UniProtKB/Swiss-Prot annotation:
Source superkingdom: Eukaryota
Gene Ontology biological-process annotations: lipid homeostasis; negative regulation of endoplasmic reticulum calcium ion concentration; tRNA nucleoside ribose methylation
Protein's gene: Thada
Organism of origin: Mus musculus
UniProt-listed Pfam families: DUF2428, TPR_Trm732, TPR_Trm732_C
Name this polypeptide is given: tRNA (32-2'-O)-methyltransferase regulator THADA
Length: 1938
């Protein structure tokens, strides 16, 4: 990029009339030195900027004129002309302000004459009668009052006339506005004029009030009458809801200002305004003039908005400073806030909410002003403990989570001002000890961190009280805040609070400490927690900390960088990180990157030399964790200086990075890589410009020595070489078969190169030009990118080709090639593969833009199209027109054929491809600048007709109510007859009998056109697939459906694109009209028909896209008839929905199909700044219909209304405008759920789900109700007050019926939705004592809902109860619930009641235990003792006295919770709980349970599995306790793990095994000896493994054995399992090869551990293990197969990681070479897996393999966590090194060459039958590879083999295997050449799959032949002999790690 040009100021030049010009000429002197000459010269200039300089010379010229010049007629005329010029200029023209500024310095002698001139011209302005010129006059009045003495004087002179004009103009504009009701564009302009008029009147009164104050007091003067008239107008505006709210709010300001100006005595003004606001004014006490002007404000009820704007005016227009209004002013201030509090409960519209919050914030500022003036009267009212601040706090707490950011900001302002008010009332007291502040701090800290308002308020407290006070309460607060920074929605708030805190803390420490030791404390508090997060936090948390927090702390304390580096460097060796954690290396790179980007590192050299070594940088560039790689790249690329020179090391590292990171799977990572590299390229370009200038200066004769002179040129050459090398890598990455991510990255980076280094213009030098590195081969590579199945790749390639236009032009010289390309594009445009038409559109657009159409096509264009052919835009338009005509001709023929046979069209020429190409051609045209209008008009008319014809052909399938994709064929006559009813509904245009009669097929699922042709006479050879294929294409349902809905989709998009040719003028004679009004209406009718009647979602979703474009344009259209169309369409469809006419074609199923989309499009396009009248009308109608229970019209209108409401509540474009209707929607959903009609219930459920998401947000947490998706009851019911009585009443009704007889359990299904809402509400600790919207009334009803006969409802009631109970009320609630349970002696009780109550106890107790961890031990244990005592009283519920297993299970779960949080009594100590006999009771329950005494039931008993699980969970801790008491002695215990494992119930065995597995796993991880218990259980485990038939238990047994040392149990297999160790191994391998995935993986790991143990324990007799080893290797290879689940491949990776030192890298190979290489091939296969988890696991194998003693020198990345992309190369490097160590080159090389060649690949079969299965999978183009790239593996292997041969100097003996490979490779090369010749022209586009496969195999074959050629007869190989594409990415292995 070159130096940016400074933007030139554009100023419109002033002009004068002819008469004034003649006047100036007549007075101008010959020398041109008088004022007339100066003005004449000025007006003759055409440049406004030059005129500004002339105007500035006027006053200096007049200052030189003597006093006699006053009478000079020339000067008088000139001043008059200047006045005329001033009033002729527009308000925004800079000339106007310059002229006013200059004339302010006019000599005094000329002021009188000038004032007269300005007054005269202002009078002319005021006499204007044209309503549409009023705005200009108002602007002139406003500018006269704006720092312009002459203007103000002229306004004062004409004050009466000015006021009269304002009064007249406002009345007339308001009347005009009413006339244009419905025309939004005109109304918006008129209301803008009204707003300006009101503001001008206010300015006038404020500016003139001083010098003309007496004018306002004379009630008989015309000025007074005008003032009263204006006041009356403002009052009318204030009450007019049809005006914009800005007009209303400004009128409120004006009303108060005028009353303040006119009312006398002023001392009574506060009382008057107070009476108006409180609606307490007496008509008799109000002055007559005020009553006449503001009667509606004085004597009638006024809307809430009017009161709100009057409060705003009062606060803004009265003088609150210095307490000048006295006690009455203070009383008024308090009255205002009470009015505002009242309004806050009434106002629900979001815009008024916003006004209210601003006004309340303004009120707090006014209160502070009065308090600062020393007022004592308000101190009692504004102290923190008084009523007003408490109400303000409630407002803050209610709204601090509001969806509107601006409103949340106002709550922060209010809170800060409230603290300031409290401080002022305290008169210097210490706030740190103030009870109000202490209570506020405590309550805020108790809140959960997901509440956004907490952060802002805490920040205000820190600013007021200081951070020390808060840290003293809880010093872990910094860590707590960092913990929540994983949530993106909280990150900005958290980082702001942290910044406030650490700044305050540093200032405090600095002021308190003399020495520098305070810095260590500050680092420990604020920096060290950040480093902990960077090293080990979760991914989102780390990213957000780096982006939001780290820059702030470094910017504030740059010296902390050295502390960070010191800490991280010390831990880098032990914390390199992994795929899941960054480690210290990642944290180090993040800190350095941030520091450099923000200028805290002076240069890159400083970083490399002093802070981090180069080896660390290189490790970071290929680290397994993507963010570490990004941060390291950012460290290299980012700099705060855009011209900083890029060092040689940086360029080398970037080149290294690009080589291995193009194939990133994460879109976010790819975007960051491309963005960072673009920054680097910009740095290179910018610094190169500096270097060029430096070089030019150094080349002068007086320059310094030569070494300095050549330095810039050396760097520039390095830049050029670097850029060329980067582009080489990028182009080589676009090889055949490269993945989507590689192509995307490479093309994006190449596009950045082309953008940053454009072709030079003029004298600008550029260091690199991409076009110089583009040859024909690379151009072809870019063209082949069009064949990608991903459109992003096509777009990037197209854009890049456009940037290389100079190169592109040279590639289209061959006319034959052009013809082939164009023909290929046409053929692709009618392909049955949907993505082919996209390729066709790109090819056609490329040919169009390069003026490269075939000669035959160009010759057919009319002569007049050649005009302007030299211009790019003209060429583009001409070529587009020609291509569209060509496509339309083909489309017309195809539509005609489709009208005869839709089947033939679907199979041979689906028409949507043609339409797609036409649409894409239009989209790349500048539709607002078409020149060939006479050609376009008839073409567009014809195109519209074609679109409608096509739509008519495919509509029967799309609009059918039959199942989507139906083709009316079947295999038997009975089924076929049932289809006839559906067929009768379809009215197609096919002339054959396809849609008229069902067909019976013979043993096939598709319908062959040849079969059809035998029975239908008018189908002949046209039934064959276009393209002269040998076999006719079977037509599947998918093909017909795809043809139809894609055709509808493309027609919709085309029409939407054509709508951009609007705006339309009504007259057809206009030259730039392309669409007539009638055509636009037809397009709208088309969309209406298909949106309202289409059944197929794919069709109406895309029709919606096109319709949205139309409605958006219509709403902006100046044509009134078109502008009103959306409203007409909306009212029409609402009437049709309400009518419920049986003949209506509206779809009542499929969620009303396209109807919601239709209404969405009409409403979403309504201007957001309007009053949203259409939305209001629609929502009222729909909610009324949704709530309607009238069965007389059926339920169809209600279903439609519910479905449409659901769509509207989901539409984010409606924003806060939809919120006022949430309450109505919720009522409709809850009531609709009780409907007896299924369709209503279904639609109600969907609507309810949308409302929950709209109100509570998208679910982010894993739990059912995440904390971030909850809301306090106060906030919820404040926003939706109607729902409070509704929900309470509904819940009361439901709760009163839960005890109904069992025969009617579902009488109130609405309970389900009620509880779903209520479980998302919770009481806030900040709610205070206010009970107006308390949640307490809901609690008894929720508890009662727990008695529901429906299990699910009882569970929901239990969960819903938890958030309603405050944490300190839970113990008492638990006791009350437990006491309500029946006693064992009670005769009559219901188990449903017991179960519901126990569930509530369980969930409450669980929440209490979780939240009470931070409470003092004494309180917690005492409360828990009370709960335990109540629980113990109902112990019979856990015994056999209770026959219900379900309730027994829940009671036991409660006991389990209690046992978990209570410590067992130790010997010699007796706790309070022990005295209760709690532990004895628990033990008694277990010992008397069925676990000991046996089970009398079967699985048919309800609740048995649940009971068994609960009982076992309670028993297992008791088993451990018994074992601990026994202390290893062989004592008989009544319950043991052996007994549990022998249970006949899998639930019991499963839990026991899980416990043992957890202990075994922890022992292994901690590298401890296994527990004696586990060692002694070998017998039970082996027996269980042999006989276990439950998959889950069997899997866990195998896992336990795997985690135990085989030496502990393997020798016992013969005794207990009756299998020798060898047989047990074979048994485990057999399971691994036959069983299900999880078991298979565990068995494989177990077998691998056994075989490793046997190998290590049988060192002297390893040969005997050979058969087992071979079978194990085969099993591992088989387990890598793609046909197996991911778990299988992950198990293989784990196995190979653990056995790598033994089988992969052992200095003395244990396996045969073939077996060892097979395992290595498995590693390479896993590294190329499409699944990221598998690749990451495979990299662990490589890390282990290259970190052994004999391999750590093979690479420079030993012991490093590396990414899979480079792990492949490193694995091959280690393997080649091992072959050399093992001296196995001769037998190993043919095997590796065989990997290259892939022997056995049926190449010819793949190419000759490419369409196998094509009919069934029309959307699949080929095997899509998202990661694996065959040629990447080929290049890496070739590179390593060549390096190995060069390094070893190995001479190839004459090998039979190598000769065999030579022969196969040669034959394959010949076959490939032959197959290439058989492909058609442009095969890369027409036969992409086959072409790509051949290219890949060609590369593989050539690689083998090259290597074999190198081996033949060459004794010494050199590295430079290696092919460039292999050599370029060879990683050096010389640099040692740090």
């Amino acid at each position: 990029m070159g130096v940016k040009k400074k933007r030139e100021m554009q100023v419109a030049a002033l002009t004068v009339c002819h008469q004034d010009m003649e006047t100036l000429r007549s007075f101008a002197d010959m020398e041109g030195k008088n004022l007339a000459s100066l003005l004449l010269h000025c007006v003759q200039l055409t440049d406004g900027v030059s005129q500004i300089h002339s105007i500035k010379q006027i006053v200096p010229l007049l200052e030189k004129v003597d006093k006699n010049g006053v009478c000079d007629p020339a000067i008088q005329s000139c001043l008059d002309i200047l006045a005329g010029i001033y009033f002729s200029l527009t308000l925004k023209n800079p000339l106007k302000k310059v002229l006013a500024s200059s004339l302010n310095g006019l000599p005094e002698v000329f002021l009188t004459q000038a004032t007269h001139s300005f007054t005269f011209h202002l009078q002319e302005e005021l006499d204007t009668a044209d309503l549409y010129s009023y705005r200009k006059v108002m602007d002139n009045i406003s500018s006269c009052m704006e720092n312009f003495n002459l203007g103000r004087a002229s306004v004062v002179n004409l004050l009466k006339d000015v006021l009269h004009f304002l009064q007249k103009s406002l009345i007339e504009i308001l009347e005009e506005n009413r006339k244009f009701a419905g025309n939004r564009i005109v109304q918006t302009q008129l209301m803008s004029d009204l707003l300006v008029g009101v503001r001008v009147a206010m300015t006038l009164v404020q500016k003139v009030q001083g010098p003309q104050g007496s004018l306002w007091n004379d009630s008989s003067s015309p000025i007074w009458q005008s003032m009263c008239g204006l006041l009356s107008i403002f009052t009318k505006f204030l009450n007019d809801d049809d005006l914009l709210q800005t007009v209303e709010s400004t009128s409120g300001l004006a009303v108060i200002l005028f009353i303040k100006t006119m009312f006398r005595p002023s001392e009574k003004l506060p009382g008057l305004i107070s009476s108006l606001l409180l609606r307490s004014a007496e008509c008799t006490s109000i002055p007559e003039w005020l009553m006449n002007s503001c009667r509606s404000l004085c004597c009638t009820d006024v809307p809430a908005s009017t009161l709100l704007f009057l409060c705003q005016g009062t606060l803004a227009m009265l003088d609150w400073q210095d307490g000048s209004m006295g006690p009455s002013g203070e009383a008024l201030l308090l009255d205002i806030v009470h009015v505002l509090f009242t309004l806050s409960s009434q106002i629900k519209e979001s815009t008024l909410d916003m006004f209210l919050s601003r006004i309340l914030a303004s009120w707090t500022s006014s209160a502070i002003q009065i308090l600062e003036s020393g007022s004592s009267g308000l101190k009692g009212h504004l102290n923190g403990d008084s009523c007003v601040p408490r109400r303000l706090l409630e407002y803050v707490y209610t709204h601090w989570e509001h969806p509107l950011d601006a409103l949340r900001h106002q709550t922060k302002v209010m809170f800060r001002n409230l603290l300031q008010m409290h401080r002022l009332t305290m008169e210097g007291a210490d706030l740190a000890t103030d009870p109000f502040c202490l209570e506020l701090t405590k309550s805020l800290l108790q809140l959960e961190w997901h509440i956004k308002g907490k952060y802002a308020c805490l920040g205000c407290l820190v600013e007021t009280l200081g951070i020390e006070h808060i840290l003293a309460i809880d010093k872990t607060i910094p860590s707590q805040i960092l913990e929540v920074m994983g949530d993106q929605s909280l990150v900005p708030y958290a980082s702001d609070l942290l910044e406030t805190m650490f700044k305050n803390h540093k200032s405090h420490l600095k002021s308190q400490t003399v020495t520098n030791t305070w810095m260590d404390k500050w680092h420990e508090t604020w920096v060290f927690p950040v480093l902990s997060v960077l090293c080990g936090g979760n991914l989102d948390q780390r990213s957000y900390v780096i982006d939001y927090y780290l820059p702030r702390i470094l910017n504030y304390s740059p010296e902390s960088l050295h502390y960070m580096v010191h800490i991280l460097q010390a831990s880098t060796d032990t914390g390199t990180g992994s795929c899941n954690h960054r480690g210290a290396l990642g944290a180090l790179m993040a800190c350095l990157r941030t520091a450099r980007a923000h200028g805290h590192l002076q240069s890159a050299t400083q970083a490399w030399e002093n802070l981090v070594c180069s080896a660390r940088v290189k490790q970071g560039l290929i680290h397994q964790h993507c963010q570490v790689r990004i941060d390291t790249l950012g460290l290299l690329c980012e700099s705060n200086r855009s011209t900083e020179v890029v060092s040689t090391e940086e360029m080398q590292w970037v080149q290294f990075f690009i080589t291995y990171n193009l194939n990133s799977q994460s879109p976010g990572v790819r975007q960051q890589i491309c963005s960072l590299l673009k920054k680097l390229f910009c740095r290179i370009q910018e610094s190169s410009q500096v270097l060029y200038k430096l070089e030019q200066r150094k080349s002068t004769p007086d320059s310094e020595n030569g070494s300095i002179r050549e330095q810039p040129s050396v760097t520039l050459q390095q830049y050029k070489n670097f850029m060329s090398s980067v582009c080489n890598i990028l182009f080589e990455a676009l090889f055949p078969g490269s993945s989507y991510s590689t192509r995307f990255s490479a093309l994006t980076i190449l596009g950045s190169v082309a953008e940053v280094f454009p072709d030079p213009e003029g004298n600008i030098q550029t260091v690199y030009q991409l076009s110089h590195d583009i040859d024909a081969g690379r151009y072809q590579i870019l063209m082949e990118c069009f064949t990608s199945t991903f459109e992003e790749v096509k777009t990037l390639a197209f854009d890049l080709l456009m940037k290389l236009s100079s190169v592109t032009a040279g590639q289209f010289q061959d006319s034959e090639k052009l013809q082939d390309l164009f023909q290929a594009a046409l053929e692709l445009s009618t392909s049955t593969k949907p993505y082919d038409c996209v390729t066709a559109s790109y090819l056609l657009n490329l040919l169009i833009r390069q003026d490269a159409l075939p000669a035959v096509l160009s010759a057919s264009s009319p002569q007049q199209l050649t005009r302007g052919a030299g211009e790019t835009s003209a060429v583009l338009e001409r070529n587009t027109l020609v291509v569209i005509k060509c496509l339309m001709e083909n489309l017309e023929d195809e539509i005609s054929q489709a009208e005869n046979s839709l089947l033939q069209a679907a199979s041979s020429f689906p028409m949507y491809g043609r339409v797609h190409c036409i649409t894409r051609a239009f989209q790349r045209l500048p539709l607002n600048d078409l020149r060939l209008a006479s050609e376009w008009r008839p073409l567009l008319g014809r195109l519209l007709l074609l679109s409608y014809r096509l739509s008519t052909v495919v509509a029967p399938v799309i609009q059918s109510s039959s199942p989507e994709g139906l083709i009316p064929v079947d295999t038997d006559s009975a089924s076929a007859s049932r289809l006839q009813l559906i067929l009768n509904e379809i009215q197609p245009r096919d002339t054959n009998d396809y849609f008229n009669h069902t067909k019976i097929l013979k043993e096939c699922d598709s319908f062959d056109l040849e079969d059809l042709s035998t029975s239908v006479s008018n189908i002949d050879s046209s039934a064959e697939v276009k393209g002269k294929e040998e076999k006719a294409c079977d037509v599947t349902a998918q093909m017909v459906l795809a043809c139809c809905w894609r055709s509808m989709k493309e027609v919709a998009l085309l029409l939407g694109t054509l709508c951009q040719l609007l705006p339309v003028q009504p007259g057809p004679e206009s030259s730039n009209v392309f669409l007539t009004v009638q055509q636009v209406k037809e397009i709208g009718d088309y969309f209406k028909q298909h949106l309202l009647q289409s059944r197929h979602r794919g069709a109406f979703e895309l029709a919606y896209t096109g319709f949205v474009k139309l409605t958006e344009i219509l709403n902006r259209c100046s044509n009134v008839s078109l502008q009103k169309l959306p409203e007409q369409w909306l009212r029409s469809v609402l009437e049709e929905i309400k009518g419920s006419d049986p003949s209506s074609k509206l779809c009542a199923t499929r969620r009303s199909a396209g109807i919601p989309f239709y209404i969405q499009a009409l409403l979403a396009s309504e201007p957001k700044k309007s009053r949203m009248d259409l939305l209001k009308i629609t929502m009222r109608e729909l909610i009324s219909l949704a709530l309607s229970a009238d069965d007389s019209k059926g339920r169809v209108p209600q279903v439609h209304a519910l479905n449409i409401l659901r769509a509207l509540f989901r539409d984010t474009r409606l924003g806060e405008n939809i919120i006022p209707y949430v309450a109505g929607g919720a009522k409709a959903a809850i009531l609709g759920f009780t409907s007896p009609v299924w369709a209503v219930r279904n639609s109600s459920t969907l609507l309810f789900s949308s409302l929950i998401t709209r109100v509570f947000g998208v679910k982010r947490g894993k739990d059912e109700v995440s904390k971030t998706n909850r809301m306090t009851g106060r906030e919820f019911f404040s926003r939706f007050p109607e729902l409070y009585p509704f929900l309470l009443k509904q819940l009361e009704t439901v709760a009163s019926t839960v005890d109904s007889e069992l025969g009617e359990p579902d009488r109130h299904p609405g309970m389900f939705l009620l509880l779903l809402v209520l479980e998302r509400l919770y009481p806030s600790p900040m709610d205070g004592t206010s009970s107006a919207l308390s949640l307490a009334p809901f609690v008894p009803f929720i508890i009662r809902c727990g008695r529901s006969p429906i299990y699910r409802s009882r569970e929901m009631a239990a969960r819903a109860l938890v958030p309603f109970i405050m944490i300190d009320q839970i113990p008492s609630t638990l006791c009350a619930l437990l006491n309500s349970l029946p006693n064992s002696t009670d005769q009559c009780f219901r188990q449903n009641h017991i179960h519901g109550t126990l569930l509530q106890v369980f969930h409450l107790l669980q929440a209490y235990i979780t939240d009470c961890r931070h409470r003092t031990n004494a309180d917690f244990l005492q409360e828990l003792s009370d709960v335990t005592a109540c629980t113990k009283a109902k112990l019979w519920l856990a015994m056999r006295q209770n026959p219900c297993l379900v309730t027994r299970a829940v009671y036991i779960d409660i006991l389990f919770l209690l046992t978990n949080c209570l410590d067992r009594p130790e010997e010699g100590k007796q706790t309070a709980l022990e005295s209760l006999g709690f532990w004895e009771d628990v033990r008694r329950i277990i010992l008397e349970s069925e676990l000991i005494k046996g089970f009398p039931w079967t699985f048919k008993v309800p609740g048995l599995p649940q009971y068994l699980q609960s009982l076992t969970k309670l028993a297992i801790p008791e088993v451990w306790a018994s074992l601990a008491e026994a202390k290893g002695q062989a004592t008989a215990v009544p319950l043991s793990f052996s007994r549990l494992l022998k249970s006949s119930f899998p639930e019991v065995r499963l839990l026991a095994l899980d416990t043992l597995l957890e202990r075994a796993r922890s022992s292994e991880q901690e590298q401890k000896e296994p527990l004696p218990l586990l060692c002694s259980m070998g017998e039970e485990l082996l027996l269980l493994a042999m006989k276990e038939d439950h998959p889950g238990c069997f899997c866990r047994v195998l896992k336990i054995l795997y985690h135990l040392n085989p030496s502990e149990w393997l020798p016992q297999t013969e005794c207990y399992a009756h299998l020798s160790p060898k047989e047990f191994l074979m048994w485990s391998m057999d399971i691994a090869s036959n069983d299900r995935s999880e078991i298979q993986g565990v068995a494989l790991k177990l077998a691998s551990k056994i075989i490793a143990y046997r190998v290590q324990s049988c060192e002297k007799n390893k040969d005997s293990l050979a058969p087992e080893l071979r079978q194990w290797v085969q099993l591992v290879v088989w387990s890598c197969g793609d046909h197996l689940p991911t778990a299988s491949r992950l198990a293989v990776a784990e196995v190979l990681t653990s056995t790598a030192p033994l089988f992969l890298t052992s200095p003395q190979p244990i396996l045969e070479l073939q077996g060892t290489l097979s395992l290595w091939r498995c590693v390479l296969t896993l590294l190329q897996s499409e699944e990221q988890t598998v690749r990451e696991a495979a990299t662990e194998i490589v890390t282990t393999a290259m970190s052994q003693g004999n391999t750590c020198q093979s690479t420079e990345f030993a012991f490093c966590q590396v990414d899979a992309s480079i792990a492949l190369t490193l694995a091959l490097a280690v393997l080649c090194d091992l072959l050399q160590q093992w001296d196995q080159l001769e037998p190993g090389l043919p095997i590796l060459l065989g990997w290259l060649l892939e022997e056995g690949d049926d190449l010819e079969g793949h190419v000759q039958s490419p369409h196998q299965g094509e009919e069934e999978h029309i959307f699949e183009k080929s095997e899509v590879n998202f990661w694996a790239e065959t040629l990447t593996f080929v290049k890496s292997l070739c590179r390593q083999l060549f390096h190995l041969l060069c390094q070893s100097g190995w001479q190839s003996p004459h090998s039979q295997k190598l000769c065999h490979l030579q022969r196969i490779a040669s034959e394959q090369s010949h076959l490939i050449s032959q197959l290439f010749r058989e492909l058609p022209l442009s095969a890369e586009f027409l036969k992409t799959v086959e072409y790509t496969r051949l290219r890949i195999q060609e590369e593989r074959t050539l690689a083998v032949l090259r290597l074999l050629a190198c081996l033949e007869g060459k004794e010494g190989l050199r590295a430079e002999d290696c092919p460039r594409e292999w050599r370029q990415v060879m990683a050096p292995r010389t640099e040692a790690a740090c």
